[in-house]
UniProtKB/Swiss-Prot annotation:
Cited function: Displays ATPase and GTPase activities.
Coiled coil: none
Binding site for ATP: 12-19
GO molecular function: ATP binding; GTP binding
A Pfam family reported for this protein in Swiss-Prot or TrEMBL: RapZ-like_N
Native species: Lactiplantibacillus plantarum (strain ATCC BAA-793 / NCIMB 8826 / WCFS1)
Cited NCBIfam families: PRK05416.1
Binding site for GTP: 62-65
Protein family (similarity comment): Belongs to the RapZ-like family.
Key words of the record: ATP-binding, GTP-binding, Nucleotide-binding
Domain of life of the native organism: Bacteria
Record protein name field: Nucleotide-binding protein lp_0779
Length: 294
């Protein structure tokens, strides 16, 4: 049986980073197409399959109108019934405020802002794209990412992951820097004792053994850890059965330095015994950046 075409559909909010995404996929060896009319994709896929010369395609789809959106959903329905194409959707997102800021910096108009108000266009686009985001294999929140960090995130997900194995993204974060909007599950651990107030631990992080030991040795932490891990292990089969290719679990504390980092590491390592797990710490460098600026 011939190898199926690996198709990645890149979509998401206007201004969320699709240009950087295309460049990243080109570097990964994908044949990239920008804004092909969705109705042409099934025929294009057939031609590619017949030629046998192209194995990986990344297609960028932007929202132009409600009719264009309807074409996208029809296209996805057709691809679901195609056995020679393996389709994954990458949805790029960012907070409304960050998207508005980016548009103001570039002085561009939003494609859906009929009266010139960028925020109105962003809100309308988010509403239209909600069903597509729900279908996405991967959602990346670019609100706090640099272009380099977005590129690294794409490489992490697509450089070697050519199968459909269910995997888990474990993410620590600080509430003071905002919620990660790409998370499926968010857990707040600010109820645990904070190492920040221990002088010898304040400048360390949850990756350092003294901090990890302090956090994990608290009675409240052990009880939470056992119960939360048990819950996660009980619901994972359901997410797999629903066809999700990935699940993002975000654990947050105040600054994303100590408690959330230690617990994200510990829970991620436990889940890695049974699942493919990627662990990242979104805000662990924030304090270093603050110190360098002071």
């Amino acid at each position: 049986m011939a190898e199926s075409l690996q198709l990645v559909i890149i979509s998401g909010m206007s201004g969320a980073g699709k240009t950087v995404a295309v460049q990243s996929f080109e570097d990964l060896g994908y044949f990239c197409i920008d804004n092909m009319p969705p109705a042409l994709l099934p025929k294009f896929s057939e031609l590619v399959e017949e030629s046998g010369k192209i194995k990986k395609v990344a297609l960028v789809i932007d929202l132009r109108s409600r009719a264009f959106y309807d074409e996208i959903m029809d296209m996805l329905a057709n691809l679901d019934n195609t056995d020679f194409v393996s389709t994954r959707i990458l949805f790029l997102d960012a907070s409304n405020e960050e998207l508005v800021s980016r548009y103001k910096e570039t002085r561009r108009s939003h494609p859906l802002a009929m009266e010139g108000r960028v925020m109105d266009g962003v809100r309308k686009e988010r509403e239209l794209l909600a069903p597509l985001k729900d279908r996405a294999s991967y959602v990346i929140d670019t609100s706090t990412l640099t272009p380099r960090e977005l590129r690294e995130s794409i490489f992490d997900k697509f450089e070697t992951d050519q199968d459909e194995t269910f995997h888990i993204e474990m993410l620590s974060f600080g509430f003071k820097y905002g919620l990660p909007i790409d998370a499926d599950i968010v857990m707040d651990v600010r109820f645990l004792p904070n190492p920040y107030y221990i002088p010898e631990l304040k400048k360390l992080t949850g990756l350092d053994k003294p901090v990890a030991d302090y956090v994990m040795q608290q009675p409240a932490t052990e009880a939470f850890y056992q119960q939360f891990l048990s819950m996660l292990e009980s619901i994972m089969p359901g997410y797999e059965a629903e066809g999700k290719s990935s699940l993002t679990i975000a654990i947050g504390c105040t600054g994303g330095q100590h408690r959330s980092v230690a617990l994200t590491q510990r829970i991620g390592e436990a889940l890695a015994k049974h699942y493919k797990v990627h662990i990242s710490h979104r805000d662990i460098e924030k304090r270093k950046e603050t110190v360098n600026r002071s």
